[in-house]
């Protein structure tokens, strides 16, 4: 795996995600996740583990979507765990991630809720 820039602050992960996604780098996006991370995607489902997350992003990024930077909401930090979130540009809810500080001081996603879907009625 190539040497990627590390997120040295929890908020760095969102910027790195946008940069890597916009060049189609699924492995680079997956490198932002812990080995056993859980992503709440596709809607209503879960993708578990860095390799499965990489495979998912490979499919998504094959369509060459364009991601725009989103202004982060205030980060909540408790020790080595942080909650980061961003409001989508269209104002429809929020995205949230739980990230954990690694032994080298960098941060990786542990839990990722990329979009909130209202429950079915």
Please annotate each region the language model reported.
Residues 1-28, 38-121:
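A beta-strand edge to alpha-helix "cap/lid" segment located at domain peripheries
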């Amino acid at each position: 795996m190539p040497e990627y820039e590390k997120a040295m602050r929890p908020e760095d992960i969102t910027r790195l995600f946008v940069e890597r996604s916009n060049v189609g780098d699924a492995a680079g996006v997956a490198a932002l996740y812990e080995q056993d991370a859980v992503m709440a995607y596709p809607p209503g489902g879960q993708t578990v583990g860095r390799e499965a997350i990489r495979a998912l992003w490979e499919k998504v990024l094959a369509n060459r979507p364009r991601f725009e930077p989103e202004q982060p909401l205030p980060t909540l930090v408790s020790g080595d765990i942080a909650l980061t979130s961003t409001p989508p540009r269209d104002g429809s809810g929020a995205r949230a991630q739980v990230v954990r500080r690694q032994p080298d001081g960098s941060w990786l996603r542990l839990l990722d809720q990329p979009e909130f879907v209202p429950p079915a009625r």
